[in-house]
Curated annotation (Swiss-Prot):
This is Adenylosuccinate synthetase. Gene3D superfamilies: Adenylosuccinate Synthetase, subunit A, domain 1, Adenylosuccinate Synthetase, subunit A, domain 2, Adenylosuccinate Synthetase, subunit A, domain 3. Binds 1 Mg(2+) ion per subunit. InterPro entries: Adenylosuccin_syn_GTP-bd (IPR018220), Adenylosuccin_syn_Lys_AS (IPR033128), Adenylosuccinate_synth_dom1 (IPR042109), Adenylosuccinate_synth_dom2 (IPR042110), Adenylosuccinate_synth_dom3 (IPR042111), Adenylosuccinate_synthetase (IPR001114), P-loop_NTPase (IPR027417). Substrate binds at T290, T291, T292, K293, R294, P295, R296. Plays an important role in the de novo pathway of purine nucleotide biosynthesis. Catalyzes the first committed step in the biosynthesis of AMP from IMP. NCBIfam families: PRK01117.1, purA. It comes from the Bacteria. Signal peptide: none annotated.
Length: 411
């Protein structure tokens, strides 16, 4: 059986810590979408690990780690992450169906961002997915055979010829790209496998599989705050599509949310706090992007968005992250509805323009940092947790009270 860990905000919810915390109970940890535009930070034995492509189970020797077919892969960045760890042979597997990000994709991404101003990381993620959908991309499996790779490169060079000048590709681009693959393909080849068959077989054998999403539900290309979204499907449903596991293989769906809200980049954010309180949350929560180092926009928990995300994913339980960041705040706000042009909205609309948050205020608490038992939390803290559970209709089974792995309350 497989369990899914999915972010139910705009990403950066703390999925890495949760996967790292529970990975010891699984045989496989699988990253199922996105690219190195996403980052997750794991603190293990006091050491901070910032990962972008590598599944979070890499710190557990018994875990097999898979990068599955809907992930887009920068082979250069993956090689750099591989070099951070030892003994990854037979522990890391990259789907032969996953698509490869090319330098051209990065150039195109930067060019488009100048005019669209979506707030992308300019890592080439979107253009790589574009080529995938146009059925013209290069896949990881193509790197296993030099002849096939050369054929794919010739098609690629022909396709981009009209755009070389626009995307600032120099005269040596073809030579440089061939040298790029000559450098990195041999390092990656030992890890490229048919992960779809591997996971189907593992599921049939009853092995435990943890499916790890990137970004968050509200950045989903179809169901998020379009056009300020990522280029992949970020909901739990995409875990099946990417891995080849059928929906009946899914057991628990664990939704990850912070005790407040953040967003990086542009796009609507109704509960954003632009007063010094927003700065307080940013500093207290160390809210700076793992990938871009950009400061995240911060605000109060948005239950309208949270209920929407839980419904989309079919969450069976929640993990509440960074509760300790709210320590010492006298009054804590929660967005319970929106007002838009005189109308009260309790459901999440496709367009958040003109949506103003309606808040409910709670008394704050002194301290929760480092607490590992529910009974040790102050009454006001427990009331805040209970309110979230009741409003969303999903039980909170895990609460994080610091970045450290052990500072976790299991319910």
């Amino acid at each position: 059986m497989a369990d899914v860990v999915v972010g139910i905000q705009w990403g950066d919810e703390g999925k890495g810590k949760i996967v790292d915390r529970i990975a010891k109970d699984y045989d496989f940890v699988v990253r199922y979408q996105g690219g190195h535009n996403a980052g997750h930070t794991i603190v293990h034995k006091g050491v901070k690990h910032s990962l972008h492509l590598m599944p979070s189970g890499v710190l557990y020797s018994q875990c097999k780690n898979i990068i599955s077919s809907a992930v887009v892969v920068s082979v250069k960045d993956l090689c750099e992450e591989i070099s951070m760890f030892e003994n990854l042979e037979n522990r890391l597997f990259v789907s032969d169906r996953a698509h490869v990000i090319l330098p051209y994709h990065v150039q195109k991404d930067a060019f488009k961002e100048k005019s669209q101003n979506i707030g992308t990381t300019k890592k080439g993620i979107g253009p790589c997915y574009e080529d995938k959908m146009a059925r013209s991309g290069i896949r990881m499996g193509d790197l296993l055979d030099d002849r096939i790779l050369e054929e794919k490169l010739k098609v690629h060079f022909k396709a981009i010829e009209p755009f070389k000048e626009a995307y600032d590709l120099n005269e040596t681009y073809e030579k440089d790209l061939r040298e790029y693959f000559e450098q990195y393909a041999p390092k990656i080849r030992p890890f490229i496998k048919d992960t779809t068959s591997m996971l189907i077989e593992a599921n049939q054998k009853g092995e435990k599989i943890l499916l790890e999403g990137a970004q968050g539900t509200l950045l989903d290309i179809d169901l998020g705050t379009y056009p300020f979204v990522t280029s992949s499907n970020t909901t739990s449903a995409s875990a099946c599509v990417s891995t080849g596991l059928n929906p009946k293989a899914i057991n628990e769906i664990i939704g990850i949310t912070k005790a407040y809200s953040t967003r990086v980049g542009n796009g609507p954010f109704p509960s954003e706090d632009t007063t010094p309180m927003g700065d307080h949350l940013r500093i207290g929560g160390a809210e700076f992007g793992t990938t871009t180092k950009r400061p995240r926009r911060c605000g109060w928990l948005d239950l309208v968005a949270l209920k929407y995300a839980c419904a989309l994913n079919g969450c069976t339980q929640l993990a509440l992250m960074k509760l300790d960041v709210l320590d010492g705040i006298n009054e804590i706000k929660v967005c319970v509805a929106y007002e838009r042009r005189g109308e009260k909205l309790e459901t999440f609309p496709s367009d958040l323009k003109d949506c103003v948050p309606i808040y409910q205020t709670f008394k704050g608490w002194e301290k929760s940092v480092g607490v590992r038992k529910l009974d040790d939390l102050e009454q006001n803290t427990r009331e805040y947790i209970r309110f979230i559970e009741e409003e969303v209709g999903v039980k909170i089974r895990l609460i994080s009270t610091s970045p450290e792995r052990e500072d976790t309350i299991f319910l």
